[in-house]
Amino acid sequence: MFQVIRRFATSVSNVADIVIIGGGPAGLTLGTALKNSPVTKHLKIHLVEGGKIIEPLNSFLETPPPNYLNRVVSLTPSTIGFLDSIGAWSHFNQERTQSYDDIVTYDGVSGARMNFEHPDIATMVETTNIQAGLLSRLNELNSQQEVKLVIQEDTKVTSIAKDSITQWPTLKLSNGDSLTCRLLVGCDGYNSPVRHFAGIESRGWSYNRWGVVATFKFADTEFRFPTGWQRFLPTGPLALLPLPNGYTSMVWSTTPELAEMLLSLDETEFLSMVNAGTRLSTEELSMIYDLAKSKSPDLLEQIQWRLNLFAGKLKPADEENFPLQVSEIVTGSRARFPLKLSHADTYVEDRVALVGDAAHTTHPLAGQGLNMGQEDVKSLVGALERATSRGLDIGNSLALEPYFSERWPQNHVLLGVMDKIHKIYSTDFAPLVAARSFGVDVLNSLGPIKDFMVGRISGNSKR
Amino acid sequence: MLIVQQFQKRSFIIPSLISSGLSYLSKDIRLADKMEDGELHFPKTEFEKSQNTSRPLFQRPEPNYPGHVPLYNFEKLLMFLGSSIGAFVNPTNNNFIVSLGESTAFPWVLNRLRTQMLNDPSGRQILKERPHMTSKSLNLDELKNYPDNSLGKSYFLWLEREGVSPDTRVPVKYITDPELAFVFQRYRECHDFYHTITGLPIVREGEIALKLFEFMNLGIPMTGLGALFAPIPIKSSQRRRLLSVYYPWAVKNGTICKPLINVYWEKIMKKDIDVLRSELGIEKPPDMRELRKKARSKKKQVA
């Protein structure tokens, strides 16, 4: 008898309307957006995160670290508009964000280039800044409301099962608690436990490439407007994206063995290597890669020789066709991550929804990954608002289906486009290089088509 | 008759109409030109008028390196046509060979050679130092004191036997990229070392055999054209000897031997030439002068 009562008591005290797994940008945005909406703010929401986030994120805002962190993403105007509409954007540390108007991409083999211009075409923000801003907004919302969003940090989900009576998802947490909910939302990344629980298949492939990231400072040789640079090398694109005060965030997608080589260099060698990567021909680069792999002691000297030759040949008028050289690296900012394409067969099951990386991962070449997740959140919140105002059970497939049917096709198109761009550029086969360069030259001179593309990547023409 | 008359009439009327129309418009055209140049509101002073600031009708782009003559593609094409016919008709004229070589040294060919050099330590050193071979830089006078059978001594003896000098090499003029121009210059200057190491003489037959060897090894188009067309106008006995002895040798050795463009000849002058040959993977072909002598004496005996 006692046992029955106790079990009853536990299950009552730990029932939530929505449980969000994962305190990354997607999870925090979803929590904030739901609490911000007048329709859904009364819902009882738990956010479960495996790591510690509250203390580090608060201290990020109170005493920002002196250096830029290496996990930086580019936000589209559409994403920023959404963050602003839920009241979070003003909580960001604005001094650490950098918006820019101009993106230049150039072909590493033929040099064919493309310019995308649009006011505030993208904004670079550290992911920690995003999380901290959202958490700050969430605290503000919590202080104004009776039903508060509960963040359970440093808590791992040990198992997910269906409740035997209600068929609702029931979580066992590492602190011994159990949690039952009407709707379980997985914002828990690529290896999403929620997706596994729901039995949703995710399909795709590894690109067999790694993204090497690091934070640099540009050499202070001349004034430049902040510009996003991307050079398509046959091994993968090398992007230098602007941060405030002449700093820049690099993502160099490359083969696993080259990524390993890049991480094994010392910092001055790595700097030279990045400068070589933005300028030198693929033949010169392959020589330099070989020297670096064999740990040649005169690597720096050889790179400098080729860079000097390059600078000697460059006409003053063409100098602005290349990014400035980087001259300083933020110590310890080097890291790498694997690149893969994956797309879940569906985003929703009965009482389960997937958001962000749990549903899809993509190549970072157009900086769309996080923005797609933000669009997911926007759409899911809309679906939940409609369901709530119509008196539907928010865990019901009927309530969730609109989210899936709106987002899946759009994400699928974007994933496909990124995949094709990656494939077109990952060869140096001469006829293909000629064809893609011709295509780029034509596109670059067709204003309206380019404007359409800019609209797509900056998320303006979606609605 | 009538038509002719009418035509004549019209041929008088139409041009006069056009010219009167133009003279009517020309005032406007001149005015527009003046406005564009800003002379309408800010007329030129006497001093400015005295300065001749107009650009010449045709101007070549700036040279990329000393001695460079930038050519347009159609000029390169004309040069190729002229020099290829000239070289076929009169192969002993060095001007034709030189221009044929430069007009067919396409960037992708030289780029491939440069890539080969970049990926080899000594090739890289050559690219970095950009050495030029002259009789002075090679210290010809010292070479004769080198040990017998050393590369330096053999080179010296070969120069003496053939009566040539390393100073007769023409500088590259028409290749756009300075580094690629150096690569081609380097090929040109090393040509005599290829003679030395293979022992082929500078008679027409020897040059043809060496051209095929070079083409197989370096892939320079001019050498391939030479190997293809040069044997056509020569004596049939010579052609037979080329095809039966020297072409098979050139194909085999040119393909298997290491890229000769990467050899820093100046630095290995003291090396034994036989050792060098085996390092590079070249077999010495039969002595061409000997074979020719034998053939000639045989012919005499028959006669």
Swiss-Prot record, chain B:
It holds the Pfam family Coq4. Zn(2+) binds at H191, D192, H195, E207. InterPro entries: Coq4 (IPR007715), Coq4_euk (IPR027540). Its cofactor is Zn(2+). Keywords: Lyase, Membrane, Metal-binding, Mitochondrion, Mitochondrion inner membrane, Ubiquinone biosynthesis, Zinc. The keyword Calcium does not apply. It is a peripheral membrane protein. One of its GO terms (biological process) is ubiquinone biosynthetic process. Its EC number is 4.1.1.130. Its main location: mitochondrion. The keyword Mitochondrion applies. Disulfide bonds: none annotated. It is found in: Mitochondrion inner membrane. It catalyses: a 4-hydroxy-3-methoxy-5-(all-trans-polyprenyl)benzoate + H(+) = a 2-methoxy-6-(all-trans-polyprenyl)phenol + CO2. Lyase that catalyzes the C1-decarboxylation of 4-hydroxy-3-methoxy-5-(all-trans-polyprenyl)benzoic acid into 2-methoxy-6-(all-trans-polyprenyl)phenol during ubiquinone biosynthesis. HAMAP family: Coq4 (MF_03111). Belongs to the COQ4 family. Component of a multi-subunit COQ enzyme complex, composed of at least COQ3, COQ4, COQ5, COQ6, COQ7 and COQ9. This protein may be expected to contain an N-terminal transit peptide but none has been predicted. This is Ubiquinone biosynthesis protein COQ4, mitochondrial. It comes from Komagataella phaffii (strain GS115 / ATCC 20864).
